[in-house]
Design a protein with these regions (language model features):
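Structural motif
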Residues: 33-35
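A short, Lys/Arg-enriched amphipathic alpha-helix followed by its capping loop at the start of a domain
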Residues: 1-4, 161, 165
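Mid-sequence, gly/pro-rich, charge-dense loop/helix-turn segments that line enzyme active sites
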Residues: 43-150
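Zn-dependent metallopeptidase/amidohydrolase metal-coordination segment
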Residues: 156, 162-170
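Short loop/turn motifs at secondary-structure junctions
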Residues: 30, 48, 121, 166-168
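Active-site nucleophile and cofactor-binding loops and adjacent substrate-binding regions
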Residues: 11, 149-153
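N-terminal short beta-loop-beta anion/metal-coordinating cradle
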Residues: 1-29
Length: 170
């Protein structure tokens, strides 16, 4: 892709499947950076369908080893989230905006359909092995991870593997 070797994969659903795939990419393919993309559900009311969130921090919203440690804290690591490098997040935001703005036909079709151009945010993600299908579940995650803009089932596991193997993640 533009002179850079790229490995594209589908990890399957869930944290374990995503972690397995990330580990394979790092160990077998010797990737130097992982660009994670996927589908997420909005936790923040300002997000609309089609908006893009480039992650700053990843939380496992279903991590709960209380009373041994606080909710969200990853056992033996003493932390509750995994962060991207700020410059990688910013580069990701800029790339997504450039990509969206480059497709004039797509933007025209959105306008004709009465839809707005997707907004791009840098923010926090919450991941867990739960499909969030109710307001009650959504509110529970928002309560436990108030900074999270959206929720998925894989990204925090990939972030943990990337940190374990010192592989940058965007």
């Amino acid at each position: 892709l533009d002179g850079v070797q790229v490995v594209g994969v589908f990890s399957r659903w869930g944290k374990v499947a995503a972690a397995t795939t990330a580990t394979e990419l790092i160990l077998k393919f010797k990737v130097q950076h992982i660009l994670f993309t996927g589908i997420a559900g909005a936790l923040d009311d300002t997000l609309n369908v089609g908006d893009v969130v480039v992650a700053r921090n990843f939380y496992q919203h279903d991590m709960d080893a209380r009373p041994l440690m606080p909710r969200l804290q990853i056992p033996l690591l003493g932390k509750d989230n995994f962060s991207t490098k700020p410059e990688d997040t910013q580069r990701g935001v800029e790339a997504v905006k450039k990509f969206i703005d480059s497709d004039k036909d797509f933007l025209r079709k959105l306008h004709l359909a009465g839809l707005s151009k997707p907004a791009v945010y840098a923010g926090d993600m919450a991941s867990g092995d739960l499909f969030v299908s109710s307001t009650k579940m959504r509110n529970s995650i928002r309560k436990n991870v108030p900074s999270a803009l959206c929720v998925d089932m894989e990204s925090a596991a990939v972030a943990q593997v990337c940190e374990d193997y010192d592989c940058p993640l965007t």
